[in-house]
Amino acid sequence: MPGNPQLQESRMSHKETGMRLSRRSMLKTILYTPPILMFGKGGLFADGEVKPLYEPRRIDPNQKVRTAVIGVFNRGAQVIGEFRRFGRQIEFAAFADVAFLEPNASLRGFEGVPCFRDYREMFERMHEQIDAVIIATPDHAHFPMVVHSMLLGKHVYVEKPLAQNVYECRLLQKMAKWCPDVIVQMGNQGHSGEGTLQFREWVKAGLIKNVRKIDAWMTNSRRWHGWTDTSYPEAIPPIGFDWDIWLMRRPFRPYSEKLVDGNWRCWYEFGCGAMGDWGAHILDAIHRYYLNSALPDEITTKLIGPSDLIYPQGSVITFKFKARDGRPAVELNWYDGQGNNPPAPPGVEGNLGNVGSLVYCEDFVVRGTSHGGLYRLLSGEKTKELRDAGKLPETPRPPSNHYQNFLNACQGIEPVNSPIEVAAPLAELLCLGCVGQRFGGT
């Protein structure tokens, strides 16, 4: 970048850099440079292919994966609990969270594990003792943290969505090619579930075919329903809470309780709304195995209670996919907002529930849930007919759940189930939906 001689001097391969900068200097340059500046014109990696500063450590099955966690409260605490079940495979090496209010904080139950407010300081001081990173932060922080982790050769488990906009999703796909030995798993945990494998087998068997319409919905109440904010609220942060790190170089907004503790999902600038939160759990099998991770050719939106700052009170987003791969054109409709369910299929009475999907196949309709739950045909008669004819494939049992799958992949036992190659196109679909919710129209 003009005016930054360190960055200008650093625009070179790591081998060349070693002549001018120590590896430690390079480490600091990577950590304290926003990724968008690293890859932009004049940036650290503007000239093409990137290699990690450190190669990922080879971890044998009899060795534990030394894991740091960024974002340890709220969802982070739940994820820690899930990984802790596999104590024979994981060792928690460090924790980082802007909400560690005391300089020498510790996490209950993990006394002795170093804690940091700033994840960059954690990497700077402990990168040699870390093999993998769990990222359970607000959506806007996922991308820079994933990039920094990958450039340091650390395997990554990152909560969904993988990133918050289309540019970030596409750059991470490049990163996956540049850093092929770095394992990344997006945390749509149902992608390792039984229902996902079942849907895959139904597609392979030709059971799900000639689909022309898919409806998906999440119509539970959300945090922002009923909000009427037309400006960012303002309050004083708790003493010790590092608001600057939380913002992650986004334009300054004042601290408010309406931005933290999960409320960030409500705001365009920091979250991805209901679609980013639940779409990854409802659409993952459909997008991966029927739509073949394709992106839509056209998007239209109908909004209920639109806002300039927060997600609408409800929406219907229609993604149109052209005919491809020998399959007809498909219309995927996403519904959110209280009571904003799709119409029920012909002959179906009663409430569809607040979460689910309907896949309109050639001869029947398939009902899905979320988080890797099992699919079923709405017609019991058709189900019996297919089962009696031996045309209803058996559902494979997953060899591991999503969390252990990540640890297994780090140890070379099995491939990861939701790598960037799968997760980024899904995240991009969700981000495109969020763009539609923000701006409306087609």
Regions from the PLM with identified roles:
Residues 138-139, 143-191, 206:
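Beta-strand-loop-alpha-helix segment that lines the small-molecule cofactor/substrate pocket
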Residues 71, 75-76, 178-185, 190-300, ...:
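Predominantly a Rossmann-like dinucleotide-binding segment in NAD(P)-dependent oxidoreductases
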Residues 30-39, 52, 78, 254-259, ...:
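C-terminal helical cap and adjacent loop that interface with cofactors, partners, or active-site loops
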